[in-house]
Amino acid sequence: MINMRSILTYSLAILGLICFLSVFFESNNPQIIFSAILIGMMGFFRINPLIYQKISFLNDFKLDLCISLSAAFFIIKEISSDFGQTLWFLSICAWLHSWLAVEKLMSKESKIFPLVYSFGIPILFGFWLLFFWEVITVGLKIPTVILPPPSMIAIKFMSSLDILFADFQQTFMKSVLAGYFIGCSSAFIFAVLIDKNDFLRRGLLPVGNFISALPIVGIAPIMVMWFGFDWQSKAAVVVVMTFFPMLVNTLSGLNSSSLIERDLLNTYAASYWQTLFKLRLPAAMPFIFNALKINSTLALIGAIVAEFFGTPIVGIGFRISTEVGRMNLDMVWAEITVAAIAGSVSYGALSLIERLVTAWHPSYRLKNN
């Protein structure tokens, strides 16, 4: 049976030899020639299993990783010149070498592997995503108004840190955090009240469902008229967007405990609040954290979209809308990068807290086995 590692090995052998042959017809750069020859030799060794099995270091994942990253570095340096077939073949070979290194690493039993799996592989994947973004946009000469390369975005990002930080403060630190806290906490309180009172369940759930179906582009202008052009109106939009997901997930979590567990507490004459804090809330924690993680991204999206409908001359949404009109796409992508980093950090922080709080829960233990 052919596995993924075998497919990668044979693909690298073929592409490496093609890269080795094509370099003599196109490139004059010694670094590119060296990379192509090295990858071509590795391809020859992979075709010849006797050599490949006898030389042990050829099967080491660190060698494949070093080859891939070195080739990527040389390609980035050469990318501004004429981008021929050799660089395309070399780019694909470098990526496959990195993939093969990950496959080799996953086959090893190591104490550091969980750490590498959690951080190293996502970082490596992100690196190659940015690498091919750069290669495709520059190599195919795509206009920057359509898609700027990551290098151009990085330069704009570093030269506009003061503007980006001011926009981050306005959108995230004020609108998102305030709306997120109010929306999630109020939804949690209402979920407990609805769980205790059947009348509220029948009355509030349909209303919450109706509000959640309202389009954000319809809510945002109304909130601006009610609360003004500053961050308060954007926080109100975030409250509306985060309320219903938190409410539904909390209610589902409160009902996730089994009937046998509740009957056991009833036999000890436990009150409603004792059952809630001793059994039902701990059992609901995975559901609550799911809602918190979902809302961490919804809140940011809601605040940014709300800023399109009226805001002071600061904010991520305001900056995106104005810079698009000026065709400054590098600044638009820099703002998108800020939003992506803020959302990812928020989601990651909540995931870490969830791991600490729900480490005892069966769902967490099953997920990690």
Where are these regions (language model features)?
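Membrane-topology segments of multi-pass transport proteins
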Residues: 1-118
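Periplasmic/extracellular loop-to-transmembrane helix junction in inner-membrane transport proteins
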Residues: 24-30, 78-83, 138-182
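C-terminal transmembrane helix and the adjacent membrane-cytosol boundary/short C-terminal tail
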Residues: 42-52, 198, 255, 290, ...
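Transmembrane-helix boundary motif in ABC transporter permease subunits
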Residues: 107, 178-208
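Short cytoplasmic-facing helical segments at TM-TM junctions of multi-pass membrane proteins
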Residues: 203, 249-288, 317-320
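Generic hydrophobic transmembrane alpha-helix motif, especially the helices
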Residues: 208-245, 252-253
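Glycine-rich helix-loop "coupling/hinge" segments at transmembrane-helix boundaries
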Residues: 225, 253-254, 301-338, 364-368
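Transmembrane alpha-helices
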Residues: 236-240, 274-306
